[in-house]
């Protein structure tokens, strides 16, 4: 982010103030910031602070990467940018790809709300199965990116640095997803976030996304149970409605789902859900 902007002749505003501090927004206003790059945590916080109350009218471009932003927040931000004439770009990337791989153009949002867009010029996505066989359009599998921006390899020693180009422009992302007929990519989760209940493979990220239609939550597996850690109040009627939706979509019995109320969803230093900490909280709760 820093390098690309400096190469384009842009100036950067750097502050140690937090997003919830008045000083942060004073700096945005005083320095006449025109581009705001953020991760999901930033945009969720801005929505909770109420976008209309923040000094954002000078910002022409909002960009979002660093993980999946729930649909409700994307809708709010897109709606806000339409009233101000600014633009909101959803992006997808990894550090190993320097780091951007796709962008969803604002004018395509209404047609592809769950997508992270098409590959950047010069790049290409394919979807592979566990045997590295290319899958057809619409099939879910591992996302593989081909492009000139893919790194040479990981360097932990002088020998690694001397190894040359080990990846040869091909990055197996470890993410799962699918492509449509126009090349728009939808990310459904991480390979590492695949659970198995009674022999049935479950994409925990996909399940979490479905649950987020009802409440703010995170999902982990512990033994043969799916635990839902939630923040919002959850009455019995809402619980039944949620369970009815997810059991039908994922073909799981109601008995595998357990609920636990959390004071906050733990996050990593990069403001992503810390699932290891969530799992520990649930283990502690289960032992009580």
Regions found by a protein language model. Name each.
Residues 138, 142-205, 221:
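Conserved ATP-binding/catalytic segment of the ANL
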Residues 66, 93, 117, 175, ...:
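Active-site glycine-centered loops adjacent to acidic/histidine catalytic or metal-binding residues
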Residues 68, 102-104, 110-156:
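Adenylate-forming AMP-binding core of the ANL superfamily, especially NRPS adenylation
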